[in-house]
Every structure is written in C-alpha cells, then in structure tokens.
Design a protein with these regions (language model features):
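Alpha-helical protein-protein interaction elements
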Residues: 4-7, 18, 34, 66, ...
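Short non-domain terminal segments
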Residues: 5, 14, 40-41, 67
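Short linear motifs in intrinsically disordered/low-complexity regions
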Residues: 7, 50, 87-88
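A short, structured beta-strand/loop element
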Residues: 18-60
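Acidic, low-complexity intrinsically disordered segments
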Residues: 54-93
Length: 93
C-alpha cells in the first residue's frame, strides 16, 4: 500500500491501495494498520477539492484538516498516484 507521505497528517497516514488503482485518484486515511476497515476515503478533483466518500472513524475536525492538507499537496500526491494508475482526478458524481 503506497503511502503518499511517510508522516501522519492529523494522526493519520494518507495512502492508496494498489488494487484500487482502477478507480480515479483517491486518498485513504487510517491511523493504525493501512486497511480499508475504519479508514476514510477521499476522492480528489483536479481543482484540489475532495469528496468524502467514507468517513470511517475520523471525526469532522480531522476530516477538514486532511481535506486542507490534500488541497495544499494534491499535485505532489497526483504525481505518485500517476506512477501507479492511468486514471486521473475525480470528475464528480
């Protein structure tokens, strides 16, 4: 499971699961084991906005902090994502 960064953001690792690269760019956030159980899932748009698809065990404050971090670093994160997947940014529902 590739991590976007080696450090935690608001107490959570930001990563994606290599089997999920068939989807558009997204970010999982998990504090312990890097599994989907209990993790949040954010789909990332080309303008740096995110759609929260699953909140997991994160509280609202942590969700907002992570969304802000993604907004500030989405280009760098996309560079890593695109090494694994040809699928681009999220285009909405």
């Amino acid at each position: 499971m590739p991590k976007y960064f080696d450090f935690k953001v608001s107490g959570y690792y930001l990563y994606f699961i290599s089997k999920c690269i068939i989807e558009c760019m997204h970010v999982h956030a998990s504090d312990k084991r890097l599994t989907e159980a209990g993790s949040a899932k954010f789909f990332v748009k080309g303008n740096a906005d995110t759609d929260l698809m699953k909140q997991g065990t994160l509280n609202d404050l942590d969700v907002r902090k992570i969304q802000g971090f993604i907004k500030d670093h989405y280009v760098e994160m996309y560079d890593l994502w695109s090494e694994w997947s040809d699928n681009g940014y999220y285009r909405g529902k």
